[in-house]
């Protein structure tokens, strides 16, 4: 599982001209799954993400977490995080989990995030989405398990 986390002032995801998910301050998560990901992988990622402290408690001190600032999460599935670009000029995606595995993992991941009490908005698995965001910092964290 790979997650790119971006601290944002706001973010939204649009499908066919309709906003389907949006948040104010919080995290935009770009989420990809590999073929060996399990419930244990989800639990690890949820713990790491929901306990991350990257909001300032005072100038220059990142000591507050998402709950401390009443933040939210926008979770967007993105299989292209598993792109293989070692050969040629066109990426390959054979390292990504098949949709039949990735979609239920994505749904469970979002359920587990929401179960922590943090508001969670989502995109739509497999859809062509337009993601808009206002980076805060910028702060970008890469998770992989």
From Swiss-Prot:
Subunit comment: Homodimer.
Entry comment, domain topic: A Gly-cisPro motif from one monomer fits into the active site of the other monomer to allow specific chiral rejection of L-amino acids.
Keyword Glycoprotein annotated: no
One Pfam family cited in the UniProt record for this chain: Tyr_Deacylase
EC number: 3.1.1.96
InterPro entries found in the cross-reference section: Daa-tRNA_deacyls_DTD, DTD-like_sf
A single GO molecular function term of this UniProt record: tRNA binding
Record key words, sorted: Cytoplasm, Hydrolase, RNA-binding, tRNA-binding
GO biological process: D-amino acid catabolic process
Family, similarity comment: Belongs to the DTD family.
Main location, first listed in the record: cytoplasm
Functional summary from the UniProt entry: An aminoacyl-tRNA editing enzyme that deacylates mischarged D-aminoacyl-tRNAs. Also deacylates mischarged glycyl-tRNA(Ala), protecting cells against glycine mischarging by AlaRS. Acts via tRNA-based rather than protein-based catalysis; rejects L-amino acids rather than detecting D-amino acids in the active site. By recycling D-aminoacyl-tRNA to D-amino acids and free tRNA molecules, this enzyme counteracts the toxicity associated with the formation of D-aminoacyl-tRNA entities in vivo and helps enforce protein L-homochirality.
Statement: the UniProt record of this protein carries the keyword rRNA-binding: no
Short motif Gly-cisPro motif, important for rejection of L-amino acids, span: 137-138
Protein name in UniProt: D-aminoacyl-tRNA deacylase
GO cellular component, one term: cytoplasm
Reactions catalysed according to its record: glycyl-tRNA(Ala) + H2O = tRNA(Ala) + glycine + H(+); a D-aminoacyl-tRNA + H2O = a tRNA + a D-alpha-amino acid + H(+)
Subcellular location: Cytoplasm
Coiled coil: none
